[in-house]
């Protein structure tokens, strides 16, 4: 069996590591560097350049030099974040036929996984050159908050690059593996703060050390899939452009060549300001007008840069609070804080993290290499080269289905350890219902429409029966890569339908943040909605049973009583779809009050039939959740 390599496929830089003997080793690429810029260029003569060679020619070929592609993986063209990138990126982002965000290079449309595969090919070649043998298997890391589509797209990129992706693991978890492998012994809880080029993650991880056997268990994870060093660069670029416009009256945003030079200068200035208090951005001949060439020469202080990006750094603090809360811990329970990602070298980031946790982050973990090392460790575990290490990762958001009244019923809660499998029995909402549509959702809200729709499928051929009688077992199965498989089975007929969820688009930063944060901010409105739906369901049940009793009673019920009950039924039916819980309850009480005589008749009939109670048939439903499914025609 060959080596399983570990790859950190980053937004800004990528890195590769292997297990040599029993120790991880980061490999140098053909340029002699331990990290490779995640940049791909398509030259005029048809050559594809990757890494440093692509970066070097970017100023003269901005429209065909692609970077930060990871921000587009698994996203829709119309996503707000993609539209923001469309306006600032020098290359062309276009809509694919299915609505995904793709790129156009020299008139040809290309998918993000196709482009990311070029970086993975270079990583693969680096390993093959070092090992002197073919490499076909890899562990690739992704942000913890990547959703199903983005994970699938990453696996696709691996396949395009000729790699069998044995496992997708979360970046903070990989960093914890790198930290925990040879650091101190004993049980401890750590926080991994991962601020990379395009994404942010926080994971709370418990390391249990029993006689040298280490278990890495993720307790909670949170993050933002569209926040990273690229956003910090953009803030500085916009400031430089605005200052130049004030000084010279020329807007450089319309000049791709100037913007590419400015991007490089801004990135360089940002890095310099991590160790210096002031730097110069000096770009001669940046542009020209009728009066001649123009030069940019601006001083930027660390204080100025910090004022531009402080809001971005503060945005990382809320996920920290949520992750700690989800883990049931406080900052005092965290023994070590690990910083991952190049952007964590910024003094302001380090200060904010130190202030939040009340302790200095560890300095002995390389933020650029830790993730690749962790991926290599996991590869070593899978290959049998690394013993005594067990990794228990989690799913970042709750998963469930839509049930009666438009409620999201979770089957797997967020931060559940994966792989995992959970089944629950649901039933029909209508008599003789022959088909149901299983609508799969991801998110934290009670109202199904407030969550992310991952897909839906039909289960038909259900045996005709009274509502609440069929037993439909829905099973959610998440594999070790965090990819979801759903099945639905009619326990009576044995008919079963399965699907591997492939969401139509990735969850964008706004959607994910909204799901978790709004779920907490709007907990009260969620509770009210849940109570309203419960009342609606009770009213619906009352309507159904009363109508059935009315039908069974026939002419044994006095005409006046029958008219009063029919009026009360009509009144309750009218308010049932409204939002006024009190009104529904009042109409239910009114129906119950006028149904006294009907109840007497029903009891007499039941006794005559010798079944000892009118509610015997209802008992069969007790362990079944009412579910209402609506068949939806697939949009072609």
Curated annotation (Swiss-Prot):
An annotated Gene Ontology molecular function: ATP-dependent protein folding chaperone
UniProt xrefs under InterPro entries: ATPase_NBD, Chaperone_DnaK, Heat_shock_70_CS, HSP70_C_sf, HSP70_peptide-bd_sf, Hsp_70_fam
Modified residues (Phosphothreonine): 199
Tree of life domain: Bacteria
Keyword Acetylation: no
Keywords: ATP-binding, Chaperone, Nucleotide-binding, Phosphoprotein, Stress response
The keyword Cytoplasm appears for this protein: no
Induction description: By stress conditions e.g. heat shock.
Chain residue ranges for the region called Disordered: 606-636
Assigned protein family: Belongs to the heat shock protein 70 family.
Stated role: Acts as a chaperone.
HAMAP family the UniProt entry points to: DnaK
Protein name as catalogued: Chaperone protein DnaK
Source species of the chain: Sodalis glossinidius (strain morsitans)
Name of the coding gene: dnaK
